[in-house]
Amino acid sequence: MRKTIILLTLISLFVLLSCGGSSDESNDTPTPPVTITLRSQSISEGAEVESANTTILTLSYNTTVKVTGTGITLNGTSVTAKSNSTTSMAVDIPLALEDGTDYVVKVAKNAIVSTADPTVSAPEFTLNFKTKAKPVSTIASSPVIASTNAAKNLYTFFRNQYGQKVISSVMADVAWNYSLAEKVHTLTGKYPAMNCYDFIHIQVPDGNGWIDYSNTKPVTDWANAGGIVQLMWHFNVPKSETTTIGMDGSGVTCSPSETTFSASNALKEGTWEHEYFYAQMDRVIAVVLNLQEAGIAATWRPFHEAAGNATAKQQASWTKAWFWWGADGPDTFKSLWIAMFDYFKQKGVKNLIWIWTTQNYNGNSSSYNQDSDWYPGTSYCDMVARDLYGYTAVQNLQEFTEIQDAYPNKMVVLGECGWDGSDKTGKPQGLMPDCWSQGAKWGHFMVWYDGNAGNNTSTMVSDDWWKDAMSSPNVMTRDQVIY
């Protein structure tokens, strides 16, 4: 019996040892080798892309990868790629592209390797693509409606300077003066070439407002000193049909969320909106005709930034127009623009150069559509503007290029500029000489005001920004204006 127990014990021990051996063999099985496979690329083979919108080629793989620093070229020139900022399984290759050019990107063996095993290389990669040819810019030789000698001469002056110099301008802090232009002169020794006046308070009852728009002396004095006049209009409307407009300018707004005023109804006879729309245009027209009689022409930028955020690809509560004139969509906006254009023409206004303001892609073509469906048409404006705040010189170039390509027969101008909101140092407007050298050759720029700026000009750029701009050979100042 004892022998039997010993024998069974030995058999059990043998079985256990055998199982242990089997387990050891299992642990010694080699790990499958790492392989790298390209899963996707942001530019397809043979694609035709827009140079301004294509700055990166992203290659996505099946595993985590890293770049080694060599072996990636664009048309034979080495480029420095880097890991994608959102995933370790992709690589971004920077692209500096020109219009109308064929390109070849090559990724050599060992240029991209496995993070886990750097001896494992991504497969060699070659991509052929091209950029779209730049549309030929054919600026119209004459304005769409302006026919006074002063207006035709001013338009010709802008056209001749376009691409040669950028015309400087400053906003008159929504007042009827040129006090900020005086501050720029005190700081730099030069006046901006153009001063912008806003009809924002013209709805205040006659005789009760702090601005007497019928007194055009602040405008004629500027023009007689050699300056160019720009006019714009924050078109305020009553908050409701029964709202009384206060002597202090209260009771009105531009925001569609603060008024019952309907942009569509402004085009329908018999509505209170229609009556108000035309009554306010009559007020502005009276002032413009006084300037016309005095031999003064002006640029005219009404209904600016119409699209607001309405072109966002993914709609949300905030993706809408921020001014009432855009609240009912692009078709109504275009009808409003044309109604104003035709009414001004009917009333004999012939001294204005019309500027339409685009939102372009709101600076992000992946999130916004371009607002070309808001464009009133080539017969209804002379220039296309873009308002930019906190944009670098490189970003200015991208915006300028996109707009010029979209509207090649119009002069492209920087309608407003300055720092981004309250961020005076973190997101300033790019220096104008830098914008110019990058290729953003705006027809003119207009710096917005800020009474709390804490600088010598009360504008949304620094004193050094103004000094840099007004001393640049590419920036036109008032003493250089001749037309």
Where are these regions (language model features)?
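N-terminal module-boundary/linker segments of secreted carbohydrate-active enzymes
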Residues: 131-200, 205, 209-212, 433, ...
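Aromatic- and acid-rich polysaccharide-binding/catalytic face
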Residues: 197, 370-394, 448
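N-terminal non-catalytic regions of secreted/periplasmic and cell-surface proteins
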Residues: 24-71, 123-135
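Extracytoplasmic/surface-exposed domains of secreted proteins
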Residues: 53-72, 88-125
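C-terminal motif of bacterial Sec signal peptides marking the signal peptidase cleavage site
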Residues: 15-18
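Substrate-binding cleft of secreted/luminal carbohydrate-active enzymes
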Residues: 166-171, 411-483
